[in-house]
UniProtKB/Swiss-Prot annotation:
Gene designation per UniProt: lepA
Gene3D superfamilies: 3.30.70.240, Elongation factor 4, C-terminal domain, Elongation Factor G (Translational Gtpase), domain 3, P-loop containing nucleotide triphosphate hydrolases, Translation factors
Reactions that this protein is recorded to catalyse: GTP + H2O = GDP + phosphate + H(+)
Family: Belongs to the TRAFAC class translation factor GTPase superfamily. Classic translation factor GTPase family. LepA subfamily.
Residues involved in GTP binding: 16-21, 132-135
Keywords, sorted A to Z: Cell inner membrane, Cell membrane, GTP-binding, Hydrolase, Membrane, Nucleotide-binding, Protein biosynthesis
Organism: Campylobacter jejuni subsp. jejuni serotype O:2 (strain ATCC 700819 / NCTC 11168)
Subcellular location: Cell inner membrane
Lineage: Bacteria, Pseudomonadati, Campylobacterota, Epsilonproteobacteria, Campylobacterales
Domain of life: Bacteria
EC number: 3.6.5.n1
Protein name: Elongation factor 4
Amino acid sequence: MSVKNIRNFSIIAHIDHGKSTLADRIISECGAISDRQMSSQVMDTMDIEKERGITIKAQSVRLNYKFNNENFVLNLIDTPGHVDFSYEVSRSLASCEGALLVVDASQGVEAQTIANVYIALENNLEIIPVINKIDLPNADVEKVKHEIEHIIGIDCKDAICVSAKTGVGIKELIETIITKIPAPKTDDEAPTKALIYDSWFDNYLGALALVRIYEGSIAKNDEVLVMSTDKKHIVQDLFYPHPLSPIKTQSLQSGEVGVVVLGLKTVGDVQVGDTITLVKNKAKEAIGGFEKAKAFVFAGLYPIETDKFEDLRDALDKLKLNDSSITYEPETSLALGFGFRVGFLGLLHMEVIKERLEREFNLDLIATAPTVTYEIYQTDGELIKIQNPSELPPVNKIDHIKEPYVKATIITPSEFLGNLITLLNRKRGVQVKMDYITPERVLLEYDVPLNEIVMDFYDKLKSLTKGYASFDYEPIEFRVGDLVKLDIKVAGENVDALSIIVPNEKAQSKGRELVSAMKEIVPRQLFEVAIQASIGNKIIARETVKSMGKNVTAKCYGGDITRKRKLLEKQKEGKKRMKAIGKVNLPQEAFLSVLKID
C-alpha cells in the first residue's frame, strides 16, 4: 500500500456524544464487520467501558475503502474522552494527521471536547467538524455550528451532519476523511522511529505495543530498542489491528499503524509515549512528548477481610500489567490493618480501578478519602512530598505547605451560573475567565485547589446544574496554602484513616460536621464513646455517643437500698474500666462520611 493512500485519524468527543457508535458505523460502512457480527460498541472492549459508556483504553482498527477506483487504508485510532486519560489522548492524537470533532446536535460543545481539541491543534491535525445525532427532535445544527466557531474557532461551513444511529451522512464523512486529511509525511531512508500510543497485556503473547511508524520500517525478527529503557528485544510478531481478530503481517512500513509483539512480561516495558527504533540503525533522538503517567489522586485501599491482603497485592500486580499508570505501596493503618496507598490519574480512574478489583478479583474493599500530593517545606530547609495526611510532620517542624492547583473549565446553562459561582468560591476557586458562548450558555475558567475537586466537586456540580454542566480540569502548579491536619479521635484513639488536610479557616466547621456525621454512624456501646476532632493537641469539636443502659438492679427485689447502690457503683466501676480498654469497631460508612462533608 502506497503511503499516499493511508489516512490516520481519530475521533474527539465528549462522553455520550456518540463517538463509539460513530466508530462502529464507520467500521460497518467499510465492510470490516458484517452486520451479523456487529456488537454495539466494537471499539470498547472492557465491560466497564460498555456499562459506563466511556472509552478508557485507546483502541485502533485498520479499514479498507475504495474511492474513485483507488484503494485506501483508513486507520481509526480511538481516543479516551475522559479528562483522567488525557495523556493517552495526546499520544493517540500524535499518531494521526487528522481528527473528527464530534459534537452532539442537541447538546452542543462540552468542556472535555475543548481540552482534546486543543491537544489536536497543538499536534497540527486537520480537524473535520462532525455534528452527530441530527435525527433527534431537539437537534439544533446551526446553534452547534455557531458554538464550535465561537469557542474553538474552527470554520463550520463544511461541517458534516450525520446520525451514527441511522447511518445518515456516514458515506460522505468517509469520503471527506480521504479528501481532507493529509497522507502521512514519511522518510523511508531515515532510521526507524515508532511511537507507542497504547499497550496492553495478553495472556498468551505478553505485553503488546500498538505503534504508529513515523520513519523507516519494522519487520518480523528485527532487533529493536525501546528508547526510554534502552532495552533490546526481538520482534516476534506483527499484526494490523482489526475489531474481530488481528491480521498478521511480515512488516510495518512508515505511516502505518500496527501491533508489535516483543514477548515482554509487563506493559511497564512498553510505556505509552515511548519510541521504538532498530538496533542496527538507531534513531538519534526519541519522538518528543514522552512523559511517564503521573498519579494525581491517592487513596488507601484495604481489604475488609484482613487475610485478603496478599490477594489484593496479586490483583494490583495483575492490573499493573495492563495499566502502568497505577502506583501502589503497602501501608498500615491502626484502624484498618494492612492495605495499599494507591495512586490514580484522577477520580474516574480511581472508581474504575476499585470497581475492577472488586468485580474481576472478587475483593471487598474499603477506600479511604482521596487525597493529593502536598509539598511540605520544613523549618530545616528540607522538602518532602506526602500523599497520606497521617505522614504530615508536627506543626513546629513545618515552615509552609504547597498544594496542587488545577485549571477547571466548566460549561453551564446560564440559569445555574449564580449557584456555580457560589460553589466555586466555597471551594477556594479563583476566577480566570467568564465567557457567554450564547445567551443561554456560559464558559467559566477557574483556578481551584485539586484537593477541593477530589472530594465531591463533580457530584455537587451535577446536582446544582441538574446534570447540564460539563467539567474538565488540567494541573497547573503548586501554590502555598494555609493548611492544617484534622484528626478524628474515637474513644480517645486516633483513627488515622479519617485524618484529612483542610484549609485553616474551614477546620472548625469541617471538624464539627465530621463529628456530628460520625455520631450518627458509630454504634452505641455499653460505655460512653467520645468522638473528637482535633488539630495537633487542641480539641476543636466533640460529640458523645450515649451508652446503652443495663438494668443491674432488676433482680434485686425490694429490700435494702444500699444493696442497689452497691450494684450501681460496681456497674460504674466496670464501665470506667471498659471505657479505658474498650475497642469501638467502626463501620465502612464512617470512612465514607469524610467524603460527604462539604
